[in-house]
Amino acid sequence: MPELRQDPTTKQWVIIATERAKRPEDFVQQSISLTLPPYKVDCPFCPGNEQMTPPEKMAYRSGGPVNGPGWWVRAVPNKFSALIPEGSLIRKEEDGFFRKMDGVGQHEVIIESPQHNLCIPLMEDKQVEEVVLAYRERYLTLREDPRFSLIIIFKNHGPRAGTSLEHPHSQLVAAPIVPLSIRYRYEKAMGHYDDAGTCVYCDYIRAGLRVRTRLIMETERFLAFHPFASRAPFETWILPKEHEASFGSITVDDSKEFSRVLKAILLKMYRALNNPDYNYIIHTAPIKDEQEEYYHWHLQILPRLVTPAGFELGTGMFINTALPEETAAFIRDFPV
């Protein structure tokens, strides 16, 4: 029988369509005969083409000039930014009803490797550490700008996930507002704290450690699992075990451990599902609420194995055709 499952962190319902459920191995992607070169002469993110991007905001390099070769991780403004640093934060009305403001913010690209064809699962551990440390450095820098209310770090991998350039990269957006969907998620966590006196994500971790059927990986400080009410097959969360509302609280040592968990999970997915398209997002508290007790930063991975259709678009409720307990076991036990 199909199940309706409720996400304890958002109170949103998901349909687990067991009547049309697929086996985990049915989600393995068909092989695509596309071999990428380690370098492309016309790629703006490849070394030697630094003049094709705006001036860098930061880079980890072993030598060479600023905005030149020699780097292994590099952050630059997005050439086609959704938001720009200049402008006014004053909100204006139009036609006495509509509200608008200048698109002020910061939109950056974190170029994860000088190698054009090297994705995170195939990187050396040290390289993935440097990527996460770059996330941390840019977050800590941008949160000092009083104009910004929220910083979101995300990655689009593959065309179904919305990527437009093959070269491995992530993105960061610092915005002057907190979008309604994030405010909703935050308010639900606040409501749980008011009712129970605990962080709902900390409670989720404790429940996951008791049951363990959806657990994929556990280290000293981090946990990875498939959520009870997964929106899509193989959806994965990575959370710090200790309560931290903001990604900005992550230490250098924790960044390194987190990077190893992230790489391990993505490598399992790469091998088990044949390099699927996916998005990942680091969910974190708004800047002014970074010390609150009711939110808990985490990374969410959403593989793009199915396409949302009219029901999902019309209701906001997702239909998942895979049991999280089965997908977790499949990934957990898959040899890499």
Can you describe what each PLM-predicted range is?
Residues 1-336:
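HIT superfamily nucleotide-processing domains
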